[in-house]
Amino acid sequence: TLLCREDIEIKGKRIAIVGCGRVGRPLSMMFVQFGGVPTLCNSSTNKFRPDTMEKIVGECDILVTCTGIYDIVNVDWIKDETVVIDVGVQRINDKLTGEINREKLNERNIIATPSPGGVGPMTVAMLMNNLTLAWYKQQNIEIMNSNHCDHFRWATDERDELLEE
């Protein structure tokens, strides 16, 4: 839904996922369901070597980093207008940061989630959404089969209106 909020289409997009653990592997399956073409870069494959990763990252439309390693992807590898989803959060010099060098990233024409503060709050929101859907299902309450993007847009538009008041 982070991508839905920004009207970013997944279908047909080349997606590089750096890290194939508890976050990367399920994300790759989700992207396939939405018509994306993911490539996983994992430490157990040759796709994790810097020269190979540079090529994969340089060709992707959407980049997801979820390794827990700061500066795992050189910002110079990322082409302009790439969408970057920085999942990882770590502490460096008593400051929380993501995996991508934010200073270098901000100098480029790249769309990126904040980190920290981007994926984490969205994860909590989706957990609450799934909990609500599970409760409805348990109570045998039929709900509209709506597009997740439309539902999310409605919820965030309502929130934004409340914040403006």
Question: Model-found features: residue ranges?
Answer:
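Glycine-rich phosphate/diphosphate-binding loop of Rossmann-like nucleotide-binding domains
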Residues: T1-W77, V83, T97, R102-E103
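A charged, well-structured terminal subsegment
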Residues: L3-D7, L133, Q138-H148
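Alpha-helix boundary/interfacial micro-motifs
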Residues: M29-M30, I78, I85, G98, ...
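Intrinsic-disorder/low-complexity regions
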Residues: C41, I100, R108, T156-R159
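Short, surface-exposed, polar/charged, turn-prone segments marking secondary-structure boundaries
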Residues: S44-N46, T67-G68, R91-N93, A112-T113, ...
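Rossmann-fold NAD(P)-binding glycine/threonine-rich loop
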Residues: I85-I141
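Eukaryotic N-terminal low-complexity, Ser/Thr- and Lys/Arg-rich leader segments
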Residues: E142-E165
